[in-house]
Amino acid sequence: MSKTHLTEQKFSDFALHPKVVEALEKKGFHNCTPIQALALPLTLAGRDVAGQAQTGTGKTMAFLTSTFHYLLSHPAIADRKVNQPRALIMAPTRELAVQIHADAEPLAEATGLKLGLAYGGDGYDKQLKVLESGVDILIGTTGRLIDYAKQNHINLGAIQVVVLDEADRMYDLGFIKDIRWLFRRMPPANQRLNMLFSATLSYRVRELAFEQMNNAEYIEVEPEQKTGHRIKEELFYPSNEEKMRLLQTLIEEEWPDRAIIFANTKHRCEEIWGHLAADGHRVGLLTGDVAQKKRLRILDEFTRGDLDILVATDVAARGLHIPAVTHVFNYDLPDDCEDYVHRIGRTGRAGASGHSISLACEEYALNLPAIETYIGHSIPVSKYNPDALMTDLPKPLRLTRPRTGNGPRRTGAPRNRRRSG
């Protein structure tokens, strides 16, 4: 982490349980990020928190630290059964649930608290086997949690801590009824510690969330620009015919160490993947219909650096903790203004700098005014020379092979294609 991303406040300054501090310091976490420094004094005092902070600022460790401390500092409910978890952490996507579980594992190892994971798609029996042995902290998506609860594999009557992560996305995706169904099966709000975290929290979301919380304290860490000072933003106006060639030329010019390319549809993502894979790039594809095991493998390969480029729909835009992303390309301008913030928030994380490049084509340029109004500034426009765009491009591949790493490792220097002024 960059020192500019941290505060002078240390985890050891708080009255945290010693095992929690030990686990944090073992992982190299000594100083708090701003959202952690604001949240911990409240949660340690038993206050509910609704926290808004730009993505990549440490929200996950804020609620995990609070959760582990609370469970270690408060006895379980009397006569708690083996199928009754003590804490429930809800996430909008299975990828985010898996990531939270991975982040929680060092704390679980140090404290002896048991973790469980529940998400749809696959792994039903494997997840159930863990739950049947008893878990303290259950992390999951609402649909699978309800499934297990209806079959009495889990009972929420002993819940002491509840977390809603990426809460705005959960409401946007229509999970309000699911969330309320789960809350109705828990002890009352004043008998739990309740936390809600997200990068963006509209008044509507806060109002809905506070229905399930006990006089929550609202905390916010937000830069003057919603998009962050460390992210260089750039905008091009290509024609539809030149759009793909411009993207490939920009990739050759920028030669990003690790890039995510966002498009608005699965079909468009597959098209981009086909062009880049044919051109020898180590590229992975992440869309909603990719099998769960493959999705997790692709994310792991991208995180490890075995893939240089990830082409994704907005399923990957929220909550995933992928370090060291240097570039984000908006091949399509998103229809939702908040998705623009979340997309480019994949870069410039944890104090690092990043570069966001957006293509305002004939189809999606109409989305630009609303985006610029929402972020509070105009995106700087750059021009390109159509005659300098790449032309020696192979025929795109089709998805008849595994969707990861089809191109060889990049060993040569990038081709020199310069923009116009």
Curated annotation (Swiss-Prot):
Gene Ontology molecular function: any one: ATP hydrolysis activity
Comp. bias intervals (Low complexity): 402-414
UniProt binding sites for ATP: A53, Q54, T55, G56, T57, G58, K59, T60
Regulation: ATPase activity is stimulated by interaction with RNase E.
Motif DEAD box boundaries: 165-168
Subcellular location: Cytoplasm
InterPro entries on file: DEAD/DEAH_box_helicase_dom (IPR011545), DEAD_box_RNA_helicase (IPR050079), Helicase_ATP-bd (IPR014001), Helicase_C-like (IPR001650), P-loop_NTPase (IPR027417), RNA-helicase_DEAD-box_CS (IPR000629), RNA_helicase_ATP-dep_RhlB (IPR023554), RNA_helicase_DEAD_Q_motif (IPR014014)
Region entry Disordered, spans: 392-421
Domain Helicase ATP-binding, residue spans: 40-219
Domain Helicase C-terminal positions: 245-390
GO cellular component: bacterial degradosome; cytosol; membrane
Domain of life assignment: Bacteria
Regions that span the bilayer: none
Motif range (Q motif): 9-37
Main location class: cytoplasm
Keywords per UniProt: ATP-binding, Cytoplasm, Helicase, Hydrolase, Nucleotide-binding, RNA-binding
Pfam families per record: DEAD (PF00270), Helicase_C (PF00271)
Gene3D superfamilies registered for this protein in UniProt: P-loop containing nucleotide triphosphate hydrolases
SMART domains membership: DEXDc (SM00487), HELICc (SM00490)
Keyword GTP-binding: no
Family named by the database record: Belongs to the DEAD box helicase family. RhlB subfamily.
Function of the protein: DEAD-box RNA helicase involved in RNA degradation. Has RNA-dependent ATPase activity and unwinds double-stranded RNA.
Subunit composition and interactions: Component of the RNA degradosome, which is a multiprotein complex involved in RNA processing and mRNA degradation. Binds to RNase E (rne) and PNPase (pnp). Forms multimers.
Protein name per UniProt: ATP-dependent RNA helicase RhlB
Species this chain originates from: Escherichia coli (strain K12)
